[in-house]
């Protein structure tokens, strides 16, 4: 039995209706949810949360007005709204909203981040989210599962992002639509485990879940990953599945580095970057985006924030930052960006004429020092 089958209480391929333990949305998706909700329902179920993280603080009058409408709706419904404290997926974990949960849905494609807790967490559209907010339940077709079993220990400069770029690339030619990725024998810390499940959707998976004991039963594909031989990786434009060892693109000139997001904006990941930047000066625009206010607070308390500022980096308020290309570090025409986010589609971070490479915080920080993509082994 796969983890998904266990959590949904049904066999692969079956269609079931299940109660949802947590439903959440953010400032980018709530306006459409409100429209759909008002056409069909009157009261929101109690286990509903809203986060302002995508474009906050509001950079335009239009966005400010949309956020005002969300606040008015939330006030009518008694929905908690968490503003400017960080990214929804990170805060859901920090606040314990999914503790003891089995099923979580969110109006964001990276809701599977919470799969690091061992729950079935999926992103759904605005209309489906409105239904869950009104009924407290929804339907699922139990997905098939692909297992990823780690072996060995990663090298000192290899992070979860490197593993995921490798995995996404390895699965590129396998039909992953509506399949779950289940991870076993995971040697990474909890901060890094969240990166694994967060990145899963970029393989076109339905969700990602971390399990404890691997049964080997019921999986449509089994993928073994030897971390001891895995080099630092980078995903070339314009897809996360364009993964290659960093050394293959070493020397590529870059204009900006972004370290953060729901993928790599946790304390441990920013700390790794700070260790590299300590006492140095960045050669290109370097933006740091803590995933939550708690992460930012800890950066200040430990002196990491000062290290980064002294190195010439800019620290953003907690949130999504430039990942979605709407504010605080948008890519211009011809810009080459090295980012620790999860997507590098054409135009994702701004101009469709820019290029985005994806890498780990270690690779990104080192590259920021040299102004070009640099392998950790070559520059550490």
From Swiss-Prot:
Keywords: 4Fe-4S, Amino-acid biosynthesis, Branched-chain amino acid biosynthesis, Iron, Iron-sulfur, Leucine biosynthesis, Lyase, Metal-binding. Its cofactor is [4Fe-4S] cluster. InterPro entries: Acnase/IPM_dHydase_lsu_aba_1/3, Acoase/IPM_deHydtase_lsu_aba, Aconitase_4Fe-4S_BS, Aconitase_4Fe-4S_dom, HAcnase/IPMdehydase_lsu_prok, IPM_dehydratase_rel_enz. Its EC number is 4.2.1.33. Pathway: Amino-acid biosynthesis; L-leucine biosynthesis; L-leucine from 3-methyl-2-oxobutanoate: step 2/4. It is an enzyme of class 4 (lyase). PROSITE patterns: ACONITASE_1, ACONITASE_2. Binds 1 [4Fe-4S] cluster per subunit. Transmembrane segments: none annotated. GO terms for biological process: L-leucine biosynthetic process. [4Fe-4S] cluster binds at residues 262, 320, 323. GO terms for molecular function: 3-isopropylmalate dehydratase activity; 4 iron, 4 sulfur cluster binding; metal ion binding. Heterodimer of LeuC and LeuD. Belongs to the aconitase/IPM isomerase family. LeuC type 2 subfamily. Catalyzes the isomerization between 2-isopropylmalate and 3-isopropylmalate, via the formation of 2-isopropylmaleate. This is 3-isopropylmalate dehydratase large subunit. The gene is leuC.
């Amino acid at each position: 039995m796969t983890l998904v089958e266990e959590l949904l209480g049904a066999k692969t391929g079956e269609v079931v209706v299940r109660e949802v333990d947590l439903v959440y949305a953010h400032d980018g998706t709530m306006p459409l949810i409100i429209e759909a909700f008002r056409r069909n329902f009157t009261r929101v179920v109690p286990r509903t949360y809203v986060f302002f993280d995508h474009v906050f603080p509001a950079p335009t009058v239009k966005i400010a007005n949309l956020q005002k409408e969300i606040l008015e709706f939330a006030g009518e419904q008694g929905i908690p709204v968490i503003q400017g404290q960080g990214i929804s997926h990170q805060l859901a974990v920090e606040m314990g909203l999914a503790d003891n949960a089995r099923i979580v849905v969110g109006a964001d494609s990276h809701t599977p981040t919470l799969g690091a807790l061992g729950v079935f967490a999926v992103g759904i559209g605005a209309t489906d989210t409105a239904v869950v907010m009104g009924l407290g339940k929804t339907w699922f077709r139990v997905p098939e599962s692909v297992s990823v079993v780690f072996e060995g220990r990663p090298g000192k400069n290899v992070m979860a992002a490197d593993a995921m770029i490798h995995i996404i690339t390895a699965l590129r030619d396998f039909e992953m639509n509506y399949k779950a990725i289940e991870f076993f024998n995971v040697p990474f810390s909890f901060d890094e485990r969240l990166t694994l499940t967060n990145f899963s959707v970029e393989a076109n998976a339905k969700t990602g879940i971390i399990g404890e004991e691997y049964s080997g039963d019921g999986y449509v594909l089994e993928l073994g990953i030897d971390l001891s031989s895995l080099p630092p990786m980078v995903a070339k434009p314009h897809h996360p599945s364009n993964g290659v060892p960093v050394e293959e693109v070493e020397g590529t000139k870059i204009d900006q580095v972004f370290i953060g997001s729901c993928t790599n904006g946790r304390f441990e990941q920013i700390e790794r970057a700070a260790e590299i930047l300590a006492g140095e000066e960045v050669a290109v625009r370097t933006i740091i985006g803590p995933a939550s206010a708690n992460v930012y607070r800890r950066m200040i308390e430990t002196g990491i924030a000062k290290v980064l500022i002294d190195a010439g980096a800019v620290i953003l308020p907690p949130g999504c930052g430039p990942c979605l290309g709407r504010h605080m570090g948008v890519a211009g025409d011809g810009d080459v960006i090295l980012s620790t986010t999860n997507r590098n589609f054409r135009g994702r971070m701004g101009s469709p004429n820019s290029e985005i490479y994806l890498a780990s915080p270690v690779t990104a920080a080192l590259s920021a020092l040299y102004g070009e993509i640099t392998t950790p082994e070559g520059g550490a």
